[in-house]
């Protein structure tokens, strides 16, 4: 939801704040959405192929050399500047950065509410899914649905088999290899085509809104609550009277908008 809100606000920036790649990012915003799912993408494939417990590229993208990935991604973009692939990979990297920023801003808030993830993973998932439903209704004024987002992500497919755009395949693979040089023995598990196909199959089979941007690989039958089903306790604890780091209290939407504003700031600075 952060990425969708950021795109909407990015469109309305004053002319003086629009950098030279403004039209490239917005003109291919389906690749921004794809990048925003990027660090979560491998989970479904890793579960299916029974390699999650052995090694996880999804975990590496979340917890290992995250800044290094962005740095190497920018280097790779420099080599694509005069090529058509640049118009695809730039918005994708903007989306990827969005995911990292959102985690940096939102996770400390969730930790303050339910405790550290390592000891409270179920509570984390429940808290974040309530927050997703709440924010979607607050911003969009309708119940949570990813129909629009999933349609846009399908536009990132290269063919009917569900293969990912080849520019993204190459860029993502190369950037992972460059930012994780000690993972050479696991490079064979880098497979954006398989990750993309696994994601598409998951959302096409779902009959209810599912957490496609978070927790994709954690449980088979997760589904969001509609806001009318959120209890008073859940609403207060997770959305309207939440605990912030440092002992402060406030509305979760303030943390959400902080993440959105930071994303827009970084998009503006990333390629100056």
What is each PLM-predicted segment?
Residues 1-95, 100-272:
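N-terminal leader/auxiliary helical segments
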């Amino acid at each position: 939801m952060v990425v969708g809100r950021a795109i909407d606000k990015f469109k309305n920036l004053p002319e003086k704040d629009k950098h030279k790649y403004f039209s490239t990012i917005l003109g291919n915003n389906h690749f921004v959405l794809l990048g925003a799912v990027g660090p979560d993408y491998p989970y479904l494939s890793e579960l299916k192929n029974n390699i999650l417990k052995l090694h996880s590229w999804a975990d590496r993208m979340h917890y290992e050399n995250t800044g290094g990935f962005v740095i190497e991604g920018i280097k790779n973009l420099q080599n694509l500047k005069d090529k058509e692939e640049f118009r695809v990979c730039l918005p994708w990297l903007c989306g990827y950065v969005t995911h990292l920023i959102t985690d940096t801003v939102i996770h400390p808030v969730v930790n303050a509410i339910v405790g550290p993830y390592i000891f409270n993973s179920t509570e984390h998932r429940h808290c974040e899914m309530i927050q997703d439903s709440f924010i979607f209704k607050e911003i969009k004024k309708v119940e949570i649905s990813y129909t629009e987002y999933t349609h846009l992500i399908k536009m990132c497919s290269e063919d009917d088999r569900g293969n990912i755009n080849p520019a993204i395949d190459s860029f993502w693979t190369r950037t992972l290899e460059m930012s994780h040089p000690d993972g050479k023995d696991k490079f064979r598990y880098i497979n954006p085509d398989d990750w993309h196909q696994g994601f598409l199959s998951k959302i096409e089979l779902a009959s209810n809104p599912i957490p496609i941007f978070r927790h994709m690989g954690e449980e088979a039958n997760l589904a969001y609550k509609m806001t009318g089903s959120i209890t008073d306790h859940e609403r207060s604890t997770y959305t309207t009277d939440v605990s912030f780091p440092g002992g402060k209290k406030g509305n979760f939407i303030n943390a959400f908008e902080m993440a959105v504003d930071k994303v827009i700031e970084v998009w503006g600075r990333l390629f100056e």
